[in-house]
Curated annotation (Swiss-Prot):
Source species, domain of life: Eukaryota
Taxonomy of the source species: Eukaryota, Viridiplantae, Chlorophyta, core chlorophytes, Chlorophyceae
Subunit structure: Component of the cytochrome c oxidase (complex IV, CIV), a multisubunit enzyme composed of a catalytic core of 3 subunits and several supernumerary subunits. The complex exists as a monomer or a dimer and forms supercomplexes (SCs) in the inner mitochondrial membrane with ubiquinol-cytochrome c oxidoreductase (cytochrome b-c1 complex, complex III, CIII).
Protein name, as recorded: Cytochrome c oxidase subunit 1
Binding-site residues, Ca(2+): E37, G42
Gene Ontology CC: one annotated term: mitochondrial inner membrane
Xref: PANTHER family: CYTOCHROME C OXIDASE SUBUNIT 1 (PTHR10422:SF18)
Binding, Mg(2+): H362, D363
Length: 505
């Protein structure tokens, strides 16, 4: 019962991480069904059932984004580390923290239940009308309710994080003295509070269109209005997922380079700029819906500008590594892998920012490859870097360095084999969300499915990596979470520390 009623941020953070692990297993299993269906042209694993294929696509997208990456980065690492890093005894609202987590399991249960009702929600994770309005039965309604519960959990957690950072910092810890991970979580919380209510409004309108014959989107309504509302949430959501990974990579790179992050103030400003710009570029997902030329020109330009603060972060990490005495262990390899692969995902993002190019490859596998390079290799590599870096601190378990390196290289090779060929498929014109395809696409699809199998093997290796170990304090530790190793109490700190000298990394 301790886990059910616990208000300790450490217990709740660990619950988020365990929940994310099982969500990740579920989402990965669905992705393997997708890849095995697409391994060969013609009828495959699903025997030509296009509706079931689309239900799997919907489940995979929502589970991976909202029930794996977000609980792990924002809920898991954010809850466990944020109070300690700022010298707070716990979160500002511990009981609110508890309910924030316990809204997630019923949300996931509702989503899974929706797939079993009638034919399931075959709408894709975006749930565009009129398809989502015309789905019969209650499957889409259950999925909408699931998203509402998850969104409520996110908003409550974000409010808690912001109040904690604003009001519970240790005496002497000024804003610029906070670790970059804390900055990342705080900015993510702002994005959640501003973006998620817009999604909630769109989903309420979708629900009423489906059930009480309102006409917000269908009939005399405006289908494009839903896309505007959804992507006003959807694009900041990408940064909600990736900003905590930025923070983790900053901590790992600084730690294993044995020096402060290069250009600390610039890194903070870059995250702030990314957060701001993320709200004013949403319509680059909508270049094909008939926007006027001036609007298209604006969103093209604004999207390209995001590359500037993102590039600042990439070059600052590279400068930190270049000028430091680098100690290459598994967390550092995952951080370096993140930098390389996220950069490639960013480059294809700049390509897609051009409206003329985007109109050619919109809804093809080029777009799938782009956002999987940002998320499958960005956010997920950030999660693994954090797990290996702080895993001993959080769980008391160590990891086998050899098996961990096997995990890294299998995952690195697997995800590249899976998603790099999809750029070629997209440029050749293969549409996404289709369970069958022309024979000319068979070669690269076979390579992609083989890469997915390698990635799945890496998950099995990861599950065997951790082992019993003694908690140790790293000699190069510079942030407050490592103090816990000497005082492992139920709540983080029994006495609020007073900072005499500021550690800015």
């Amino acid at each position: 019962m301790r886990w059910l009623y616990s208000t300790s941020h450490k217990d709740i953070g660990l619950l988020y991480l365990v929940f994310a692990f099982f969500g990740g297993l579920l989402g990965t299993s669905l992705s393997m069904l997708i890849r095995y269906e697409l391994a060969l042209p013609g009828r495959g694993l699903l025997d030509g059932n296009g509706q079931l294929y689309n239900v799997i696509i919907t489940g995979h997208g929502i589970i991976m984004l909202l029930f794996m990456v977000m609980p792990a980065l924002f809920g898991g690492f954010g809850n466990w580390l944020l109070p300690i890093m700022i010298g707070a005894p716990d979160m500002a609202f511990p009981r609110l923290n508890n309910i924030s987590f316990w809204l997630n399991p019923p949300a996931l249960a509702l989503l899974l239940l929706s797939t079993l009702v009638e034919q399931g929600p075959g709408t894709g994770w975006t749930a565009y009308p009129p398809l989502s309005v015309q789905h019969s039965g209650t499957s889409v309604d259950l999925a909408i309710l699931s998203l509402h519960l998850n969104g409520l959990s996110s908003i409550l957690g974000a409010v808690n994080m912001l109040v904690t950072v604003a009001g519970l910092r240790a005496p002497g810890m000024k804003l610029l003295h906070m670790p970059l991970f804390v900055w990342a979580i705080a900015l993510t919380a702002v994005l959640v509070i501003l973006a998620v209510p817009v999604l909630a409004a769109a989903l309420v309108m979708l629900l009423t269109d489906r059930n009480i014959n309102t006409a917000y989107f269908c009939e005399s309504g405006d289908l494009i209005l839903y896309q505007h509302l959804f992507w006003f949430f959807g694009h900041p959501e990408v940064y909600i997922l990736i900003l905590p990974a930025f923070g983790i990579v900053s901590q790992v790179v600084s730690f294993f380079s044995q020096k402060p992050v290069f250009g600390l103030t610039g890194m903070i400003c870059a995250m702030g700029a990314i957060s701001l710009l993320g709200f004013i570029v949403w319509a680059h997902h909508m270049f094909t819906v008939g926007l006027d030329l001036d609007t298209v020109a604006y969103f093209t330009s604004a999207t390209m500008i995001i590359a500037v603060p993102t590039g600042m972060k990439i070059f600052s990490w590279m400068a930190t590594i270049y000028s430091g005495r680098v100690w290459f262990t598994t967390p550092m390899w995952f951080a370096v892998g993140f930098i390389c692969l996220f950069t490639l995902g960013g480059v294809t993002g700049v390509v897609l920012a051009n409206a003329g190019v985007d109109m050619l490859v919109h809804d093809t596998y080029y777009v799938v490859a782009h956002f999987h390079y940002v998320l499958s290799m960005g956010a997920v590599f950030g999660i693994f870097a954090g797990v290996y870096f702080w895993g001993n601190l959080i769980t008391g378990l160590g990891y086998h360095e050899g098996r961990a390196m096997v995990h890294f290289w299998l995952l690195f090779i697997g995800v590249n084999l899976t998603f790099f060929p999809q750029h070629f498929l997209g440029l050749a014109g293969m549409p996404r969300r289709m369970f069958d395809y022309a024979d000319c696409f068979a070669g690269w699809n076979a390579v992609s499915s083989f890469g997915a199998s390698i990635s799945f093997i890496s998950v099995i290796v990861f599950a065997t990596t951790f082992q019993e170990a003694v908690r140790t304090v790293p000699r190069t530790a510079t942030t407050l979470e490592w103090v816990l190793l000497a005082t492992p109490a139920h709540h983080a700190l029994s006495q609020v520390p007073v900072l005499r000298t500021a550690s800015s990394h």
